[in-house]
Amino acid sequence: MGHVSLRKLTAFCALALAGASLQPVAAQNAAAPAPASSTAATPAARPADVASEDAVIKAVYDVISGPKGQPRDWDRMRSLFVPGARLISAHTGDDGIVTAHVMTVEDYIRLGDPLLKKDGFFEREAHRTEDRFGNIVQVFSTYESRHEADAKPFQRGINSFQLLFDGKRWWVVTIYWQGEDSANPLPAKYLPGG
C-alpha cells in the first residue's frame, strides 16, 4: 500500500493519526469502543471483486492505483473490507523504533486520497505466498509502487492481507504492511521465482 512514496504516506499517516489521537498499537486501550465507521453500512461490492481471494486482492491494488489527478473509487474500496477492518503500517521512526499505526478504512481514505491524486500512484503485486485454514487466508503480497504505470518502482515491500470467506464472498479483514529498506531487504522467498 505504498503511496506517493510508501515512506511519505506512512510518515504522513503517522503524523496525521497522532494528531487525530490515534496511537500506536502498544499504546491503545484494547477495551476501547469500536469506531463509528465500523458500524456504517458497507457499499455493495462488485461480484467479480469478491469472488475469490485473488479477486479481492487485485481489486484493492486496482482501486488505489491511478494517474496523477484521478479520483479513486472509495466506495469500491469500502465494499472490499469487513466492517471494522484495519489497515496498519509498520513505520520506523527517526529513533529507530518500529511502531504500528492503525487506521480504519475511513482513516486511510481521508489521509491517502490527497496524496494519491497529487503524485499519481500505481501499486502491483510482484509475488505472493499464501496460508489457508478453513475460511481464513493469510497472504504475503510483495508489492511494487510506482508514480507512473510503466516507471521503475520507487518502493517495494510486503502487504500482509488477512482475508475471510463468509460462505458467499471474500472480505479483507486487515492489511498490514512494511516497506523494504536497507535494514530489511526483501528475502528471496518473497520475490518472483522465490
Question: Where do the PLM segments sit?
Answer:
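Bacterial N-terminal signal peptides that target proteins for export
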Residues: M1-C13, L22
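C-terminal segment of classical bacterial N-terminal signal peptides
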Residues: L17-A27
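Short, low-complexity N-terminal intrinsically disordered segments enriched in polar/charged residues
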Residues: Q28-S79, L191-G194
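Hydrophobic pocket/interface hotspot
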Residues: V60, M77, A85, V139, ...
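Sec/Tat-exported extracytoplasmic proteins
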Residues: V60-K68, F81-A85, S89, G112-L116
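Surface-exposed, charged secondary-structure patches
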Residues: R86-L87, H91, G96-A149
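Short, surface-exposed coil-to-beta transition loops
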Residues: F122-E125, P153-S160
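Short beta-strand edge/turn micro-motifs at domain boundaries
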Residues: R156-P185
